[in-house]
């Protein structure tokens, strides 16, 4: 069935003749012509109706518009027929080529014959030439537009780059100021720690604390005093005050001139007044008795009243008063008096804020302890309650007095044991503590750690318990050791003068020269059990130590290629500094020894230190690399003052052809 239908379709296709398709095309064309004629007749009819109904003004406007359209069309046709486009405005007499036949069409006959265009008329050649010229002008305009857009984009990019450079410069300036400020703070800290603080160090530290937010500020770890006391303690001569004025200018250039402007101006004015006093210059025509009366007159006035008085004196100085020198000198005294008074008031505000912070912290601690140790209590009679309230008020007054006394020396324990601090920073903070502060901090840490037994005072001990004096016990132990060593009494007496400070002296020797890229090293290795013949005389024990490992970057060719200062390579171990303490060594004439042994990992080795009784051997696991054994390269191996020091650096291998 399917094959028969396909045959019929093929037969029908064959039966169609060209005459049939031509007749269909003719009918379509006839129908389209009829539709076009109908539209044309409709348009003509609408136009005739519009002409019948229009007024004279509308008819005049319509004809004028029609004339303008014809003129524009004729101009366009003339422009197309002309060889030179009108926008060039070139003539035979005025053109950059000095061509007197510029508007005439050049006919290149041979070229036209080769291109097969020899049959073109003069008008056709002119038209093609004009089109080619217009095309070239259009391309030139397009190229100019692209060039201008590229130039504009390039200018925009340069402007954006300048803006980025300007912002980067501002950021770098800000970072530079921050870096300089950090350096100033670091210099201040170092000079204060070393006991050679200058006046600018104390004043800048005071100003930075005064700028902090009272709600978020921490209690300072230094004593707050009136800035004038800092000047008296640090400035002894005219040169000191002159140096202070220059230091203040340098500090304000870094920190900002507008920051604490009044406070720094007051300090500068006081320093200038002290320079005049030190130089023993006369203070105008004011006699000493008159000067005392002037000071008494200033004393009972407020800052606002003194400022008004200063304005009055300035007006008299600018006016035609009789004795300008007198008023000028009086004005100078008034300015110094105002500066001192402002500094005292500012210092009082700082102390009150600090006292309020400490009270708030004390209240929080008391509330926390009460919430943790809250127990149910029985009903108390009203009289007992009143008595207890009076006692509590008295205790609060006493606590306030104690708090005000401890304002200048309370230390935040959290900052000392902050795990985010590196070892040198933590060590610096501990060294900055005074003796009383160190006692308070250690007691607080002992209480926080919940160690056993709990810390109590000597008055709370049970009867029958003997309390030994620490110094006496150390003296007794030192005397017995010297007796066993066979040393002379004179030498033991000389050495017993500071037995307690021996370990601290050793620690100071071990910590000497510690740098920022060094860290404490205590990876001690476990050794086999040791038997000692001298164990019946002295208890064998491991020596104490303070070791350091030095790390840094190895800028070899590979790391220089793949890393930079912003993205540094991993740090590697560059050396070790072993400081092992043997203060109770029986035979001080024999220095401790050390030896290296291999371990399972070939990249590491075991270094073992041997000293003799009463100390056991001690070992550490170190990196297995070749040492630098020259003194100029940092090698040190010595035994002095009971401290065995072994410092060494690893050799650096460099590729050589």
Swiss-Prot record:
Segments of skewed composition (Basic residues): 1-15, 61-72
UniProt record similarity statement: Belongs to the CACTIN family.
GO CC field: cytoplasm; nucleus; spliceosomal complex
GO molecular function: RNA binding
Function summary: Plays a role in pre-mRNA splicing by facilitating excision of a subset of introns. Plays a role during early embryonic development. Required for the distal tip cell migration at the end of larval development and for gonad morphogenesis.
Any one GO biological process: gonad development
Biased amino acid composition, Low complexity: 489-503
Subcellular location: Nucleus; Cytoplasm
The protein's name in its UniProt record: Splicing factor Cactin
Bias (Acidic residues) ranges: 389-401
Organism listed in the record: Caenorhabditis elegans
Keyword Cytoplasm (UniProt): yes
Coiled coil: 23-77, 352-403
Tissue: Expressed in pharynx, intestine, vulva and spermatheca (at protein level).
Keywords of this entry: Coiled coil, Cytoplasm, Developmental protein, Nucleus
Sequence ranges of Basic and acidic residues compositional bias: 26-60
InterPro entries given in the database record: Cactin_C, Cactin_central
Annotated spans, Disordered: 1-83, 369-406, 472-503
């Amino acid at each position: 069935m399917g094959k028969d239908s396909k045959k019929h379709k093929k037969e029908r296709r064959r039966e169609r003749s060209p005459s049939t398709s031509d007749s269909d095309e003719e009918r379509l064309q006839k129908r389209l012509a009829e539709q076009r004629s109908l539209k044309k007749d409709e348009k003509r009819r609408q136009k005739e109706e519009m002409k019948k109904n229009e007024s004279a003004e509308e008819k005049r406007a319509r004809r004028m518009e029609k004339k303008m359209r014809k003129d524009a069309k004729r101009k366009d046709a003339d422009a197309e027929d002309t060889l030179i486009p009108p926008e060039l405005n070139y003539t035979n007499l005025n053109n950059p080529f000095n061509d007197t036949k510029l508007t005439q069409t050049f006919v290149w006959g041979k070229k036209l014959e080769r291109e097969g265009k020899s049959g073109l008329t003069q008008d056709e050649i002119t038209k093609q030439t004009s089109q080619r010229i217009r095309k070239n002008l259009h391309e030139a305009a397009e190229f100019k537009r692209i060039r201008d857009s590229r130039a504009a984009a390039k200018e925009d990019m340069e402007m954006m780059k300048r803006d980025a450079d300007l912002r980067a410069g501002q950021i770098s300036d800000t970072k530079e100021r921050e870096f300089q400020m950090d350096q100033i703070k670091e210099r201040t800290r170092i000079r204060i720690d070393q006991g050679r603080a200058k006046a600018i160090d104390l004043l800048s530290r005071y100003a930075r604390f005064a700028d902090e937010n009272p709600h978020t500020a921490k209690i300072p770890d230094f004593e707050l005093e009136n800035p004038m006391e800092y000047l008296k303690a640090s400035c002894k001569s005219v040169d000191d005050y002159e140096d202070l004025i220059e230091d203040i200018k340098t500090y304000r250039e870094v920190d900002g001139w507008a920051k604490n402007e009044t406070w720094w101006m007051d300090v500068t004015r006081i320093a200038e007044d002290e320079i005049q006093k030190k130089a023993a210059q006369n203070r105008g025509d004011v006699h000493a008795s008159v000067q005392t009366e002037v000071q008494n007159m200033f004393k009972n006035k407020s800052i606002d009243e003194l400022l008004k008085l200063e304005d009055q004196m300035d007006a008299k100085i600018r006016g035609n008063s009789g004795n300008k020198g007198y008023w000028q000198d009086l004005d100078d005294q008034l300015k110094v008096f105002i500066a001192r008074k402002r500094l005292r008031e500012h210092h009082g505000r700082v102390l009150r804020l600090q006292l309020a912070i400490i009270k708030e912290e004390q209240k929080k601690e008391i509330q926390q302890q009460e919430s943790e140790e809250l127990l149910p209590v029985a009903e108390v009679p009203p009289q007992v309650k009143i008595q207890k309230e009076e006692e509590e008020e008295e205790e609060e007054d006493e606590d306030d007095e104690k708090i005000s006394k401890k304002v200048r020396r309370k230390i935040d324990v959290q900052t000392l044991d902050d795990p985010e601090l590196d070892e040198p920073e933590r060590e610096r903070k501990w060294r900055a503590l005074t003796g009383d502060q160190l006692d308070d901090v250690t007691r607080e840490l002992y209480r926080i750690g919940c160690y056993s037994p709990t810390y109590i005072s000597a008055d709370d001990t049970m009867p029958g318990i003997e309390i030994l004096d620490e110094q006496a016990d150390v003296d007794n132990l030192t005397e017995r050791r010297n007796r066993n060593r066979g040393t002379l009494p004179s030498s033991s007496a000389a050495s017993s003068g500071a037995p307690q400070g021996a370990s601290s002296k050793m620690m100071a020797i071990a910590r000497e020269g510690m740098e920022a890229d060094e860290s404490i090293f205590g990876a001690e290795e476990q050794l086999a059990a040791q038997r000692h013949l001298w164990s019946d005389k002295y208890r064998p024990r491991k020596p104490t130590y303070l070791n350091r490992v030095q790390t840094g970057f190895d800028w070899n060719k590979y790391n220089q290629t793949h890393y930079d200062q912003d993205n540094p390579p991993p740090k590697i171990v560059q050396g070790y500094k072993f400081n092992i303490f043997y203060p109770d060594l029986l035979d001080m004439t024999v220095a401790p020894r050390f030896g290296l042994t291999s371990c399972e990992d070939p990249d590491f080795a075991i270094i073992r230190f041997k000293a003799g009784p009463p100390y056991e051997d001690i070992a550490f696991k170190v990196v297995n690399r070749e040492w630098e054994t020259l003194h100029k390269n940092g090698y040190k191996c010595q035994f002095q003052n009971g401290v065995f020091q072994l410092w060494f650096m690893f050799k650096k291998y460099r590729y050589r052809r």
